[in-house]
A protein has these predicted regions:
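Short peripheral tails and domain-boundary helices/loops at the edges of structured domains
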Residues: 52-67, 90-93
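Short hydrophobic beta/alpha edge segments that flank linear recognition/processing sites
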Residues: 29-46, 67-85
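Acidic, low-complexity mobile loops and tails
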Residues: 1-37, 46, 52, 86-93
Length: 93
């Protein structure tokens, strides 16, 4: 049975600014695959998908400030519904 989750950045992280989508609506993403790029003003980071699935909706645009609890993207997964944790961005380079 498919279920949906909304990808969020972990609350322990500082606020970020959204830079770029790396996948578009309708794309399949794998576990750990980078779905977007964000910046903290000094460095850029990739945000990985915690589960494999189909991207169905983006909630942010270029330049948006991402605050604690903001959803970035909605992804549909196959299988039994499980809790999907917020992710920590991975520094580029």
């Amino acid at each position: 049975m498919p279920f949906m989750y909304e990808l969020k950045v972990a609350a322990s992280e500082p606020s970020y600014t959204f830079v770029q989508r790396l996948v578009s609506v309708g794309s399949l993403v794998g576990t750990g695959e980078a779905v977007c790029t964000v910046t903290d003003g000094a460095m850029e980071f990739h945000v990985p998908a915690p589960r494999q699935g189909l991207v169905v909706e983006w909630f942010v645009e270029h330049g948006a400030v991402i605050e604690d609890g903001d959803s970035l993207v909605r992804i549909v997964c196959e299988g039994d519904e499980v809790e999907v944790p917020a992710v920590e961005p991975v520094r580029l380079g």
